């Protein structure tokens, strides 16, 4: 059985958020999911800090609010909490791996 990729989660969840997947910015970077209100970065739980930085950049570039979706195992609860402490203005969502 093949392990799901990050893009599989984006494809499964972004449409339910009312978003467009892989939205390309002028500098050719890609927002994982651009909704009418948020620039959403999906990433693996342990990469929470990178997700925070990308969400902030994409939000600034699009005029949307920043959000991250962390793909986590049950025992990785410390990572979403770190993201919330480090960046309290970013919406942090968690989905199971």
Regions from the PLM with identified roles:
Residues 19-21, 39, 89-92:
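Active-site regions of enzymes building and remodeling cell-envelope glycoconjugates
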Residues 28, 35-37, 53, 63-65:
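Short connector loops at helix/strand junctions that flank enzyme active sites
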Residues 11-14, 56-60:
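Short, hydrophobic/amphipathic alpha-helical patches that form generic packing surfaces
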Residues 44-52, 59-97:
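Nucleic-acid nuclease catalytic cores
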């Amino acid at each position: 059985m093949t392990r799901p990729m990050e893009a599989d989660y984006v494809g499964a969840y972004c449409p339910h958020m009312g978003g467009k997947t892989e939205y390309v910015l002028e500098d050719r970077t890609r927002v994982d999911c651009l909704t009418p209100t948020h620039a959403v970065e999906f990433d693996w739980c342990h990469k929470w800090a990178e997700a925070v930085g990308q969400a902030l950049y994409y939000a600034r570039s699009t005029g949307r609010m920043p959000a991250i979706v962390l793909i986590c195992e049950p025992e990785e609860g410390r990572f979403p909490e770190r993201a919330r402490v480090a960046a309290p203005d970013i919406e942090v969502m968690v989905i199971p791996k």
